[in-house]
């Protein structure tokens, strides 16, 4: 098994953050990312980059963090109790994009690396990550293309990889209290180390590098679609699901808050505007009902 090299992973992640920000700025054509570097008293730090009030993106945040600690937090040891008492490094790039136009989906992506060490024992390490798509007014061709790109990213690593991580994504981004998925899914993986460091790192790189390949064509296709107040209000209502998921279920959010992470960076995923409405039900046969009827349950798209 190849030896884990945290420095090489960190260099890739910093470069990935730069490339994704450059790609999103090019798609927006107007706004620029502001960078905000921070340090963590217990060890580590990061750089948050946020674009606001753009021509295409209402808010886009792309965060790099590298935190270290003397002991793993509860959120990380819940499903791996053998990690209790180990020092750790956690690094990753995480992003959430909230577009202006309701016909452009919101999206989230994340790639990360954990390593936990204890004197006299082999290091325990793994990669995780993925990306997912949350449309408000979905187009089937967009969803199929998104999943085809996801499948293409996984293909060099084995035929079983896409179905496995697609299913995991559907299961992870699910709101039990709403009985609906957060969106149309994509890829989700965690605890990846079985194939050794080099192969596992290669897969994480492929997912990170593939994100804009999957998302940019959808933005280009939908960014000039006309919309009105009805569509905007529905977008704001559905953004509420994003808030509910991130604050109640998301493992990364919980990990960040439990490790004393930087709150502004952790909550960068929150939409800038959102609304709730009591007992909302879409009108039968409406475009809004199409989302509920055909997209908020797991489907095979390719």
UniProtKB/Swiss-Prot annotation:
Q: Which UniProt keywords apply?
A: Cytoplasm, Heme biosynthesis, Metal-binding, Oxidoreductase, Porphyrin biosynthesis
Please give the pathway this protein is involved in. Porphyrin-containing compound metabolism; protoporphyrin-IX biosynthesis; protoporphyrinogen-IX from coproporphyrinogen-III (O2 route): step 1/1
Give positions of region: Important for dimerization: 242-277
What name does UniProt use for this protein? Answer: Oxygen-dependent coproporphyrinogen-III oxidase
Q: Which residues form the active site?
A: 108 (proton donor)
Cystine pairings recorded for this chain: none
Pfam families recorded? Coprogen_oxidas
Q: Which organism is it from?
A: Shewanella baltica (strain OS223)
* Assembly information from the UniProt record: Homodimer.
The family line of this record is: Belongs to the aerobic coproporphyrinogen-III oxidase family.
Q: Where is the signal peptide?
A: none
Cellular compartment(s): Cytoplasm
Q: Which domain of life is it from?
A: Bacteria
* Residues binding substrate, per UniProt: 94, 110-112, 260-262
The coenzyme or cofactor needed here is: a divalent metal cation
Phylogenetic placement of the source organism = Bacteria, Pseudomonadati, Pseudomonadota, Gammaproteobacteria, Alteromonadales
Biological processes per GO annotation: protoporphyrinogen IX biosynthetic process
- What's the gene? hemF
Q: Which GO terms describe its cellular component?
A: cytoplasm
Site feature Important for dimerization, where: 177
């Amino acid at each position: 098994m190849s030896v884990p090299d945290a420095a090489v992973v960190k260099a890739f992640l910093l470069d990935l953050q730069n490339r994704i920000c450059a790609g999103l700025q090019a798609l927006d054509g107007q706004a620029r990312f502001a960078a905000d570097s921070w340090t963590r008293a217990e060890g580590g730090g990061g750089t948050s980059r946020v674009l606001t009030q753009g021509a295409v993106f209402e808010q886009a945040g792309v965060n790099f963090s590298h935190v270290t600690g003397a002991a793993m937090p509860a959120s990380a040891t819940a499903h791996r109790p053998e990690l209790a008492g180990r020092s750790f490094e956690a690094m990753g790039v995480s992003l959430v994009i909230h577009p202006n136009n309701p016909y452009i989906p919101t999206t989230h992506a994340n790639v990360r690396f954990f390593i936990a060490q204890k004197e006299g024992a082999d290091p325990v390490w793994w990669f995780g990550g993925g990306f997912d798509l949350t449309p408000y007014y979905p187009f089937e061709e967009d969803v199929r293309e998104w999943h085809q790109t996801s499948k293409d990213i996984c293909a060099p690593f084995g035929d079983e990889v896409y179905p496995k991580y697609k299913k995991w994504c559907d299961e992870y981004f699910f709101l039990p209290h709403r009985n609906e998925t957060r969106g149309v899914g994509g890829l989700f993986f965690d605890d990846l180390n079985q194939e050794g460091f080099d192969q596992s790192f290669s897969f994480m790189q492929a997912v990170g590098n593939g994100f804009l390949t999957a998302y940019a064509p959808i933005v280009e296709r939908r960014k000039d679609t006309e919309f009105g107040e009805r569509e905007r209000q529905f977008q704001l209502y559905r953004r509420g699901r994003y808030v509910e998921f991130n604050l109640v279920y998301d493992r990364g959010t919980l990990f960040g808050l439990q490790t004393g992470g930087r709150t502004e960076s952790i909550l960068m995923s929150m939409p800038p505007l959102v609304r709730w409405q009591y007992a909302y039900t879409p009108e039968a046969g409406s475009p809004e009902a199409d989302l509920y009827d055909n997209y908020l349950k797991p489907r095979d798209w390719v």
